Amino acid sequence: MNHGLERLLGQLMNGESLSEEQSETLMIALAAGSVEPALAGALLVALSMKGESAEEVRGFANGMRKVATEVKLDDSLEPIDIVGTGGDGSQSFNISTGSALLSAACGLNVAKHGNRSVSSKSGSADLLEFLGYRFPTEADAVKTQIRKTGFSFLFAPNFHPAMKHVAPIRQALKIRTVFNILGPLTNPAKPSFYLLGAFSSEMASLMASSLSGMELKRAFVCLLYTSPSPRDRTRSRMPSSA
């Protein structure tokens, strides 16, 4: 298999994007731990230096979902995920978690996917843990929480066990890779709706384009500007087919 991946590395080093199928295959191989660490690191660095395309991000997201612990919710629940990419470096308030809890209190079914803090004062998991929330570890617990309260939080490490093979490589590289932006797109519950916040206009565009080819009913990608100008503070991108 590594011979095929070496060809993908050459493709990336030549500045050529991978197809969605190639990206999904690469993701599954990385998650299986079947790629030599040096080659895995080289592939991730080459992809980052080239710049991820929407097809590549979508392929990685689809592959990551396939190896995740499946959380199949009843269609009648029509859950929404309210999530942000993080990465703005502003050390700001965790907006997505507050919005998710408020939405659940207003009657929506929220299946929120997230992790601990990377760039903000507190990640979704940090905040919920401080409030005394207990993370579900199985799909049935997620279903029960949503039916009882309208809210459940899928703590990423509990539902993406295969990522243990990727974690050491990411830690060794110490640079941003495609995995830094996959979190919002890899909810194992496969929500019908998304409200996604991005840290830059480029990221908002990439996320919108990536979501437009995924199985969901509707998504809204938003970007908040903190300029003092009263005009154009908030911009949004709507995926054309989502």
What are these regions (language model features)?
Residues V110-G114, F135-E138, F153-F155, T177-I181, ...:
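General beta-strand structural signal in soluble alpha/beta enzymes
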Residues A141-A198:
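Phosphate/diphosphate-binding glycine-rich loops and adjacent basic-rich segments that engage nucleotide
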Residues D88-A100, S120-S122, M163, A189, ...:
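Short glycine/serine/threonine-rich phosphate/pyrophosphate-binding segments
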Residues L196-G213:
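Gly/Ser/Thr-rich active-site loops/lids in small-molecule metabolic enzymes
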Residues M1-Q91:
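Acidic, glycine/proline-rich low-complexity segments that act as flexible tails and inter-domain linkers
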Residues S236-A242:
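Hydrophobic alpha-helical segments, chiefly the membrane-spanning helices
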Residues Y225-T234:
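Conserved small/polar residues in nucleotide/adenosyl-binding loops
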Residues L44, F93-T149:
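A glycine-rich phosphate/pyrophosphate-binding beta-strand-loop-alpha-helix module
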